Amino acid sequence: MIDTLRPVPFASEMAISKTVAWLNEQLELGNEQLLLMDCRPQELYESSHIESAINVAIPGIMLRRLQKGNLPVRALFTRCEDRDRFTRRCGTDTVVLYDENSSDWNENTGGESVLGLLLKKLKDEGCRAFYLEGGFSKFQAEFALHCETNLDGSCSSSSPPLPVLGLGGLRISSDSSSDIESDLDRDPNSATDSDGSPLSNSQPSFPVEILPFLYLGCAKDSTNLDVLEEFGIKYILNVTPNLPNLFENAGEFKYKQIPISDHWSQNLSQFFPEAISFIDEARGKNCGVLVHCLAGISRSVTVTVAYLMQKLNLSMNDAYDIVKMKKSNISPNFNFMGQLLDFERTLGLSSPCDNRVPAQQLYFTAPSNQNVYQVDSLQST
């Protein structure tokens, strides 16, 4: 069969498509130089996907980093084996990306599609990349034998995509988070706004109140006795491996240290339960608690977001938005964001089949959207 290729309307000079018939033929022939990338939400991927495909997903709030070019494609894979497989084969294999249907692309808006952006980045990195005409739905309808389906899944594969998880046809918003990405400890004064202008002058020089008892700050805040006294802080959660607990021997403060570096290889999520318990202990004793790392924009933010997710029953996006409204220069590293996504699924917050009802009607309204959040039960009394 002759390979069917045609220019993609939104980027004809850089991206071409493959038909589902062509892909079926390659799978029938056992082509071992074919790398399939499923760009749908993870729930849909786990429910059913084309055989041998690997899933690539990204939180909606991280799209700006992808657009700015601060992330290599390999960084989008949350599973190490998928990342390694992509790294080994992307330079030699034919890479085919697919979303659910690839039907909404056109010359005017397709260039803003994340799938289109990913195609461009793959081309820039030297990959032979294509998109699948009609996407997964068309391939499954015509060649279901080459689809792997999880019959034990609790959610239907027809559930609507979750925007926080999938790439697919998501559009890049100018309101996305700032594009700071580093595997090293970062200086909060180096943060920039979406247009590249510094944020340092607008950032507070003291801990930021996230909840009436919960404060987010940097290492400097943890060494300022006047600040600690002003905010009634008696508990200090130090999310670094090497910064000292300065007043530990004085007996006036209770410390907990989480020995994690700001690096993609670190597993911060394993410490979520004890960090959340420590924060709750401070709340129970009507004490303020400071969560800090070095710069106060990555590790400490990740822990704070995890706390809000569990205690307020929030999705990662909503919890992140609350923190960002209070402190605009936050920038957790990409791997920590992936761990928050896993935590979201563990809490059952991302499942379309989750019909849990909050036990208490206690509310907090975030100005960034119309969602209503439980928070009164977390306020110190």
From Swiss-Prot:
Occurrences of domain Tyrosine-protein phosphatase (ranges): 206-349
GO MF entry, a single one: MAP kinase tyrosine/serine/threonine phosphatase activity
Rhodanese domain sequence ranges: 30-148
GO biological process: cell differentiation; negative regulation of ERK1 and ERK2 cascade; negative regulation of MAPK cascade; positive regulation of apoptotic process; regulation of heart growth; response to growth factor; response to nitrosative stress; response to xenobiotic stimulus
Taxonomy, superkingdom: Eukaryota
Compositional bias segments (type: Polar residues): 189-203
Catalytic residue list: C293 (phosphocysteine intermediate)
Sequence intervals crossing the membrane: none
One Pfam family it belongs to: Rhodanese
Protein keywords: Cytoplasm, Hydrolase, Protein phosphatase, Ubl conjugation
Reactions it catalyzes: O-phospho-L-tyrosyl-[protein] + H2O = L-tyrosyl-[protein] + phosphate; O-phospho-L-seryl-[protein] + H2O = L-seryl-[protein] + phosphate; O-phospho-L-threonyl-[protein] + H2O = L-threonyl-[protein] + phosphate
Main location: cytoplasm
InterPro entries from the UniProt entry: Dual-sp_phosphatase_cat-dom, MKP, Prot-tyrosine_phosphatase-like, Rhodanese-like_dom, Rhodanese-like_dom_sf, Tyr_Pase_dom, TYR_PHOSPHATASE_DUAL_dom
Gene Ontology, cellular component aspect: cytoplasm; cytosol; nucleoplasm
Post-translational modification: Ubiquitinated by the SCF(FBXO31) complex, leading to its proteasomal degradation.
Gene3D superfamilies: Protein tyrosine phosphatase superfamily, Rhodanese-like domain
SUPFAM superfamilies: (Phosphotyrosine protein) phosphatases II (SSF52799), Rhodanese/Cell cycle control phosphatase (SSF52821)
Compartment(s): Cytoplasm
EC number: 3.1.3.16, 3.1.3.48
Tissues where the protein occurs: Expressed in lung, heart, brain, and kidney, but not significantly in skeletal muscle or testis.
Residues covered by region (Disordered): 176-203
Subunit structure: Interacts with MAPK1/ERK2.
Similarity-based family: Belongs to the protein-tyrosine phosphatase family. Non-receptor class dual specificity subfamily.
Protein name (Swiss-Prot/TrEMBL): Dual specificity protein phosphatase 6
Species for this entry: Rattus norvegicus
Source taxonomy: Eukaryota, Metazoa, Chordata, Craniata, Vertebrata
Gene symbol of the encoding locus: Dusp6
